[in-house]
Structure formats: C-alpha cells, structure tokens
C-alpha cells in the first residue's frame, strides 16, 4: 500500500515533460505538475487470498414471461429520511454497511446553522485533473491472462472499477470474483518500459454460477468498513464479501411462497448505501444493509396482467432523481420511485432481454442494452415515451455485453461479440435524425469483449474478454464406420482469448513506439479497425 506522499505518474509512453493533462484551474504559467494521488489498494496483503462459500441451499426455477409494454404515469414522493448504513461483523447476519458521512458539525434540536457552509471547498488552482481523450487509439498498459487459462472453458464475464478507483473487480465462468490493485508501475517516479502481468490480491469463490455482482456504493479504500462487494449466485443467498480480506461478512436471503431459497438475478446498492435492491422474477426485493437476513420489502413489478414481467436482470439508480430503472428479460424497462417502488413508466423497444442499464451523470438521460440486439438505446426521463437516438453495436449471443460512460458523460464505450471496442462522443447527440458514429474503434483481442469499465478519476479503460465456446460438429465419415469410434463434437476451431486488460486513454500525443505483437508475457499490439 502506497503512502499519500507518492504521486501517480503517466504511463511510460508519456514522459513527465510530455505528460498530457487537462487545462488546470490556473493559468498556464501557474500550472503545477503534481498529479492526483491514487487511492490506496483494497487488498491488505500482497499474496492472493482465497475465500470459499459454505452456503448451499435449495433452488427455485423461474420461468421467463413477457408482458405488455404500457406507459404508466404515477407521481412519487422523495424519500424523506435515509436509513443508516453495514458495520463490519462476522457472518452472523447482523452486519451493516456505514452510511455516508458528512463534515458538518452535529447540532442540537432547534440549534441554528449559522456559519455552517455546505458548499464544496474550492479546488486548488495548482491541481491537475486527468480527463479522457480518444483522439487516438488507447495504449495498452497491462493485463491478466494466466489467471484465467487454467481451465479451457473459463472466460471473463465483466469487470468493474471500485467507486474510489483503487482496484478493479472481475467475474469469470469459474465462479470466482477477483480483485486487482492498480499496477504498481503507476506509482513509480521512473519511466516504465514494461508493465508486469497483473495478479489478483483476493479471490472470492462462489458455490455456483454468479448471476451478478457489485461494489458497495460508498466504498472507499481509506475506510475498510466500507470496502464490500455483493454477489449473487445460483442456489445461494446474496453474499457480502470483505474487499480487504476476502472473508464472507453477511448474507441476505430471499424465499418464495414455498419458503424455498431463491437466488437474485441482479444487484444494486442505493446511492446512500442504506439499501440493497435485488431483482427476481417479476419482483424486486429491498434489503436494509443494516439488517442482514431474510427480512426485506417485496415490490412486485407485475400484477393483474399489468406491469413489467420477466426476470429483473439489471437495476440502476438515477444520480439526480429519486428513482431507479429495472431492465427485464421480458424486453422492457421500468421506472420506479425509490421510496415506495410505485411505477412511473414502462418502456419497450429492444429486440431481446435487457442486460445492462446506465444513467448519464446529469440524471436526465439513461442508456439500455440487450442480448441479441444490435442497438444501444438512449432515453430521456423528461420524455420517457420517446426514444432519443440509438447506437449500433454487434451483439449476436445471449451474453451480457457491458457498456460504460466516463465521469463527465461525454464518451460512451462498449464492446461487442467480435471483440471490437467502440467509443462514441455523445456530448452533441441531441437529435434522432442523424446516426451517431464512433470516434474510435479498436480490437483488444480476437474474442468477445464483454466488459468495459472507465476509471472514475484517471484515464484508464479496463476491458474483459471471453465467451462460452460451443463444440462444432465434425464430419460423420463413411456410413459403414461404427458410431462409437467417431468424435461427435470438436473444439478444434475454438481459440478463446480470456484476458483482463488496462488501456491508457489520456489526452495529447503518444510519443512512445508501438507495442509489438503479443509476447510471452501476454502484451498485445492494439489493432485499430477504424477511426473517424
């Protein structure tokens, strides 16, 4: 773990005298070259740790149903109070996550608030701020590939930066959640020619296929009692993992009408960290993070043949409005009030089940993607029944293909089934009359790029690749040959490339020489497939 005095430098391709940076608050003559320090890493130990899942329970089969897409308009109330948030405890189902802290002094009842300012502190004019720039193809920094090559059928299923940017979380087909710290080369004051392969600092093993996973919304590596990860897997309860030790800290259990354990298909913490929203078949269950166990609020999304049917596959909260959006495998998107779950609108337009939702930082726009659907759709909360515009991407399988927005809301990044990563500048996309084209596209590897995640403070793009490979039938041979002597299926044509990769997307020209083709350490030359 690095101290706060150590500074983060640009990658080896950008020497200090050429390191790009956004225009600082001061004049060019007053520009300070000190960079913003990186938060300390999550994992406390250098050696990977392993945590196993001791819980196994019954399974409840859930069938996918489709419902009518009917716009609903219901007013909702703003949540008046926010419940406290999860204190770190043993697996006794009595743990809780802490609520958001403020710097305001405590006041007695009726005491005036004179002299107490809620305005943000002014930014030092000497501070340097990194911004994303896609004027050229991002440059490969480092990655992890050996970790996922122990099993031939293994592949990555997405990646997510921690809210504070200190580490990144991955999911894979071997039912293991892995946490990686930022590459140590980024902390060095010397120019780095070669980045070593990334190694996970923590491994958290689930008992079966992982449906969804997410970071605690108030996570900060400087406060260990907020460093938690939630995950849901088949035939298991929802687990809360300690991101410093990899230990299981708490469990949330949902039961059906037969009192059988049922698994959540999607997870999302509320912005204040006080609640955990979980998607089930035609139902959203809301758990209080201060009270693990089976007690929860059940919010039905489909009743009396009306509403949003199907499995709730993804959930996202608006950053500025007291509402959340739910995507369903029934090909619909529902908007609901945060406080009581009352329906606000039901949107339809996708050709397949919804797999990912993402709100714009301004809170007015949100984006949706679906499986076996070649479009990303943009919606406006001010006109929920009207589709603003769409972006084209290749999604030909049922795999969940993630997309992400940078913190400023200017760039949208998505992978596709062929592996191509596309970047769109959506800052000027205000009309649905024109087709928005990507500003840059590149090919990280020759396999499906299913996960993309943009760092919250640094111009770092993380990509995850891989997909399930199905055997291809071989030639049957002569009719006289015995059937048992013939190989019926073959994987000889499959060449999966399962990797976690980090890319530098900083502004300014890149003076470094091109990276050669992939060597024994797994570094790969970026193949640009188009740029506008």
Curated annotation (Swiss-Prot):
Subcellular locations according to the entry: Nucleus, Cajal body; Chromosome, Telomere; Chromosome
The name this protein goes by in its record: Telomerase Cajal body protein 1
A cellular component term, taken from the record's GO annotations: site of double-strand break
Molecular function terms from GO: histone binding; identical protein binding; protein carrier chaperone; protein-containing complex binding; protein-folding chaperone binding; RNA binding; RNA folding chaperone; telomerase RNA binding
Membership in a protein family: Belongs to the TCAB1 family.
Keywords: Chaperone, Chromosome, DNA damage, DNA repair, Nucleus, Phosphoprotein, Repeat, RNA-binding, Telomere, WD repeat
InterPro entries linked: SWT21/TCAB1_mRNA_Telomere, WD40/YVTN_repeat-like_dom_sf, WD40_repeat_dom_sf, WD40_rpt
Bias type Basic and acidic residues, positions: 520-532
Modified residues annotated as Phosphoserine in this record: 27, 61, 83, 476
PROSITE patterns the UniProt entry points to: WD_REPEATS_REGION (PS50294)
WD repeat start and end residues: 151-190, 206-251, 256-297, 307-348, 349-389, 395-434
Phosphothreonine: residues carrying this PTM: 474
Organism: Mus musculus
Taxonomic lineage from the root: Eukaryota, Metazoa, Chordata, Craniata, Vertebrata
Region (Disordered): 1-53, 80-122, 510-532
Pro residues composition bias: residue spans: 13-25
Disulphide-bridged cysteine pairs: none
SMART domains xrefs: WD40
BP terms from Gene Ontology: Cajal body organization; DNA repair; positive regulation of DNA repair; positive regulation of double-strand break repair; positive regulation of double-strand break repair via homologous recombination; positive regulation of double-strand break repair via nonhomologous end joining; positive regulation of establishment of protein localization to telomere; positive regulation of telomere maintenance via telomerase
Encoding gene (name): Wrap53
UniProt subunit comment: Component of the telomerase holoenzyme complex composed of one molecule of TERT, one molecule of WRAP53/TCAB1, two molecules of H/ACA ribonucleoprotein complex subunits DKC1, NOP10, NHP2 and GAR1, and a telomerase RNA template component (TERC). The telomerase holoenzyme complex is associated with TEP1, SMG6/EST1A and POT1. Interacts with the chaperonin-containing T-complex (TRiC) complex; which mediates the folding of WRAP53/TCAB1. Interacts with COIL. Interacts with SMN1. Interacts with RNF8. Interacts with histone H2AX.
Post-translational modification summary for this protein: Phosphorylated at Ser-61 by ATM in response to DNA damage, promoting its interaction with histone H2AX and localization to sites of DNA double-strand breaks.
Gene3D superfamilies in the cross-refs: YVTN repeat-like/Quinoprotein amine dehydrogenase
Matches recorded under PANTHER family: TELOMERASE CAJAL BODY PROTEIN 1 (PTHR13211:SF0)
Function noted in UniProt: RNA chaperone that plays a key role in telomere maintenance and RNA localization to Cajal bodies. Specifically recognizes and binds the Cajal body box (CAB box) present in both small Cajal body RNAs (scaRNAs) and telomerase RNA template component (TERC). Essential component of the telomerase holoenzyme complex, a ribonucleoprotein complex essential for the replication of chromosome termini that elongates telomeres in most eukaryotes. In the telomerase holoenzyme complex, required to stimulate the catalytic activity of the complex.
């Amino acid at each position: 773990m690095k101290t706060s005095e150590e500074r983060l430098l640009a990658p080896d391709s950008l020497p200090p005298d050429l390191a790009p940076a956004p225009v600082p608050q001061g004049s060019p003559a007053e520009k300070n070259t000190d960079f913003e320090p990186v938060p300390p890493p999550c994992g406390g130990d250098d050696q990977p740790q392993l945590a196993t899942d001791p819980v196994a329970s019954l399974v409840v089969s859930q069938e996918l149903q489709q419902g009518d897409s009917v716009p609903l308009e219901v007013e909702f109330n703003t949540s008046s109070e926010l419940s406290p948030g999860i204190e770190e405890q043993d697996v006794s189902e009595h743990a809780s996550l802490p609520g958001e802290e403020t710097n305001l002094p405590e006041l007695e009842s009726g005491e005036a608030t004179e002299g107490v300012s809620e305005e943000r502190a002014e930014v030092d004019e000497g501070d340097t701020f990194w911004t994303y720039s896609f004027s050229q193809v991002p440059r490969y920094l480092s990655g992890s590939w050996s970790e996922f090559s122990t099993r031939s059928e293994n592949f990555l299923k997405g990646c997510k930066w921690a809210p504070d940017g200190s580490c990144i979380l991955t999911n894979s087909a071997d039912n293991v959640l892995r946490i990686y710290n930022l590459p140590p080369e980024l902390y060095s004051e010397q120019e780095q020619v070669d980045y070593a392969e990334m190694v996970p600092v923590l491994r958290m093993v689930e008992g079966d296929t992982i449906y969804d996973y997410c970071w605690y919304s108030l996570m900060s590596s400087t406060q260990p009692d907020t460093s938690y990860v939630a995950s849901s897997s088949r035939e298991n309860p929802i687990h809360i993992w300690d991101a410093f030790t990899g230990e299981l800290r708490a469990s949330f259990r949902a039961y059906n009408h037969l009192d059988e354990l049922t698994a959540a298909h999607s997870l999302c913490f509320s912005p204040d960290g006080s609640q955990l929203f979980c998607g089930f078949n035609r139902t959203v269950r809301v758990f209080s993070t201060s009270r693990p166990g089976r007690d929860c609020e059940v919010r039905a999304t489909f009743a009396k043949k009306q509403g949003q049917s199907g499995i709730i596959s993804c959930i996202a909260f608006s950053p500025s409005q007291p509402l959340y959006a739910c995507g369903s495998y029934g090909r619909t998107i529902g908007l609901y009030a945060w406080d009581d779950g009352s329906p606000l609108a039901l949107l339809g337009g996708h050709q397949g089940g919804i797999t990912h939702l993402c709100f714009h930082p301004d809170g007015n726009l949100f984006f949706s993607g679906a499986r076996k659907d070649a479009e990303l759709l943009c919606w406006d909360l001010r006109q929920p029944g009207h589709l603003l515009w769409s972006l084209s991407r290749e999604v030909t399988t049922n795999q969940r293909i993630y997309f992400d927005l940078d913190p400023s809301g200017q760039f949208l990044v998505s992978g596709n089934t062929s592996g191509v990563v596309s970047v769109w500048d959506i800052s000027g996309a205000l009309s649905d009359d024109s087709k928005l084209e990507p500003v840059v596209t590149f090919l990280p590897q020759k396999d499906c790029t299913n996960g993309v995640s943009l760092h919250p403070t640094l111009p770092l793009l993380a990509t995850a690749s891989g997909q399930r490979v199905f055997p291809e039938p071989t030639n049957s041979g002569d009719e006289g040959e015995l059937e048992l002597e013939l190989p019926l299926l073959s994987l000889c044509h499959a060449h999966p490339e399962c990797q976690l990769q980090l890319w530098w997307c900083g502004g300014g020209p890149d003076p470094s020489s091109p990276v050669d083709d992939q060597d024994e350490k797994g570094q790969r030359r970026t193949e640009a497939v188009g740029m506008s």
